[in-house]
């Protein structure tokens, strides 16, 4: 009887050990991981998956701001009154004019200045003085005409001191009323000068504008270095003034097939 109890106890011990071992393996066969509010079940011996952070929505993306390219300023624009257009012959030999342009933002009083001329083959300088109230407006014009001038635009100053040669000559704008000499015609009193055509006595800035305008034609100062006859007569530079001055008459002017005189009452033009 005692032997039977011992055998029974041994059997129960083995049964209990087997059950405990089975329970333990079952318990550890699955790994439980709590992530946030969810449970992830993995297989024994494997690493639990790692959660990947979700990108925050609504985070602004930096924008690249482009830097504007500065607008270039046209070069060689005069900062003083210039001779802007010359017609040497209209309906008659003395139907002629000289036009001035003021590219500055202030009126300029010319009452103590003079306009002077020397023919292409001559040795004499001729002078016509400006008078009181000869004021050229800011970005405006002033028109000087011979007594034989008969254009539709009225002159601001009329004279019969000289006649522009149809072959060639030099026009001087001088800031005093002293007649020029060979020694002074390139000096500081000469504000501007323009030589056109041919002649041994031409006194140009740089080179003369070699073409002498024909009847009713004129030579006109450019608005910019890129200006040409088309842009000055019917293109983008028509109303941009006549400020270009590279100190070379040959480069600074274009030939107009039809002259276009402007006076102090004409619309101002800003370069």
Please describe what each predicted stretch is.
Residues 2-67, 71:
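Short, polar/proline-rich extracytoplasmic segments that appear immediately after membrane translocation
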Residues 13-16, 76, 236:
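Residue-level detector of alpha-helix boundary/anchor positions
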Residues 23, 28, 174-177, 223, ...:
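Enriched for extracellular/lumenal, surface-exposed ectodomains of secreted and cell-surface proteins
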